[in-house]
Amino acid sequence: MEVRQQVTPLKNLVRSTTFNYQGKNYTSELNYTNDSSIVYIDKEVQKTAEKLDQNPILVTFFNAGIITYYDNESEFDKTLNINTKATRASRLAAEATFYKDTNYNGAELKIGAGNYPDLNSYSFDNCISSFKASTTSPGFPTSAVTVRLYADKNYGGRTYAFLIAYFDGRNIVIKTIIS
């Protein structure tokens, strides 16, 4: 007797994405495969996405719904220009609250602006599912805050950077933070 395993194909979830890389906007419809891989319909976008996927120090910058990729943190820092007096002041008066579960639920870790090379000592290593960040200084109540999340401890691996004025959370596994 032959037993066949029936595999239910994933419904074609056609979505569209736009991102920026090296000053160029890329837009394509995409599909998710059964193994959760993404396949872009536009071949140029697919080729660019494959190149980005191979970069172990890629910076992914989220700003007002726009995703921009940078080859490294130095390239990102030049573009962001974070050294203005107003930005420095608001960075020093900022805080972030990280949650173990999505939608701001579960255990939380509230920290002020600073460098955190390893979240293991806070019991938040590889378990952050959402976060909120804001300025805490009355002089800068609406200033944007930049939060950087790193894939590996000691600021290693890929970087996920968020410029936050109003933020609704993200689901990203991280190990270290610098803000």
Outline where the language-model segments fall.
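Compact beta-sheet-dominated domain cores in extracellular/mature segments
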Residues: M1-S179
